[in-house]
Amino acid sequence: MKIGCVYVNAGKGHYIPAKAISDELTALGTETEMLDFFKIIDAPKFDALNQNIWRWELKFPKIEQALNARADKTSSAKKKLKAFASARYQKNFSRWIENNHVDAFICTHYIPSLILSEFSHNLGLHIPVFAYSSDVFTTHCQD
């Protein structure tokens, strides 16, 4: 069994928990692979934008708090899902999954968990997608 540990590359906040999960699963005898979400769907511009926004928000924590108070809601997640669930990114994911085998995904950010679930369902794949919220101050997808 191979588990893909998916993170959003915006700093250490999602990578470190994904790495910890990967290390523990490996210690238990499960094969794992660390996966950058934006590389899976081949979206380098979103990857760069996400990193720049997060670094900017770290410099201005009050702005980050105000933005994320509204951004980390179910309605916002649905809008993001719609944006990423385009045919282009689904095709990129399909191409990636043809060349890379995983039996399940564990995501440390809510956006990849929603999008990979949607893509897997749309493509008729039976790949379970698990979400592990590594954000300390917010609980995503709750209104």
Predicted stretch roles:
Residues 20-99:
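Conserved N-terminal ligand/cofactor-binding loop architecture of enzyme catalytic domains
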Residues 7-17:
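A short, glycine/small-residue-rich beta-strand->loop->alpha-helix junction that serves as a flexible
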Residues 6-8, 35, 132:
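Short hydrophobic segments within beta-strands
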Residues 69-143:
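Active-site and donor-binding regions of nucleotide-sugar-utilizing enzymes
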Residues 12, 41-43, 138-139:
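Flexible, glycine-rich phosphate/dinucleotide-binding loops
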Residues 1-4:
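Extreme N-terminal starter segment of soluble prokaryotic enzymes
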